[in-house]
From Swiss-Prot:
Pfam family, one: Proteasome
Gene from which the chain derives: prcA
CDD domains: proteasome_protease_HslV
Subcellular location: Cytoplasm
GO cellular component entries: cytoplasm; proteasome core complex, alpha-subunit complex
Stated family: Belongs to the peptidase T1A family.
Name of the protein in question: Proteasome subunit alpha
Organism: Acidothermus cellulolyticus (strain ATCC 43068 / DSM 8971 / 11B)
Regulation of its activity: The formation of the proteasomal ATPase ARC-20S proteasome complex, likely via the docking of the C-termini of ARC into the intersubunit pockets in the alpha-rings, may trigger opening of the gate for substrate entry. Interconversion between the open-gate and close-gate conformations leads to a dynamic regulation of the 20S proteasome proteolysis activity.
Amino acid sequence: MSTPFYVSPEQIMKDRAEFARKGIARGRSNVVLQYADGILFVAENTSKALHKISEVYDRIAFAAVGRYNEFENLRVAGVRLADLTGYTYDRRDVTGRTIANAYAQTLGAIFSGATEKPYEVEIVVAEVGDTPDGDSMYRLTYDGSVAEEHGYVAMGGQAEQITAQLKDRYVENLPLGEALRLAVDVLSRASDGGEPRTLTPDQLEVAALDRTRGRRAFRRFIGAQLQELLRPTS
């Protein structure tokens, strides 16, 4: 009788982590950063039907990279949790931290489980406050780990390159247009070959949580409005 093949738990977790990281690295990058009036989301995305950035609740939004069907399942679950909590208790009880913790539990359970593959996703949950000090951004990885970020966060295959550029160039309280142009510029410079590219409005998905809009803070930028924001000021 042959001896059963043995793989240590440590090796299994290592292999699952490597599998998830490779899947995420194939995705185009996203940038989330704070600006003067809120939180800006910029994704390289040529699809008009499949969103990588979405509203979750009044002042909470979601950005993701990786497998669309997997992060879309998480987005829908987050929206349902937010709606149920707001309806059962109070809208003020729905927070970005609540949504992020729920996602962390789901991702952690899937990553540790033996019956299905880990999710190939990375997520940012952001909530805009009444002031910049009240803003919050939570980054979640494939294994359910959560990190609270400040200022900016990059996800996707070129996240390290983008983060290094933002570390040198980002400043607090940028106007919306300047923040958007910075995000697009660092995305355009992040490539395997190191050569900067030209990203047109048709290749971008852009949205923001704007604290000046009241309860429904989420807004998208498309068409002429996006082109105007991308135009350099003289």
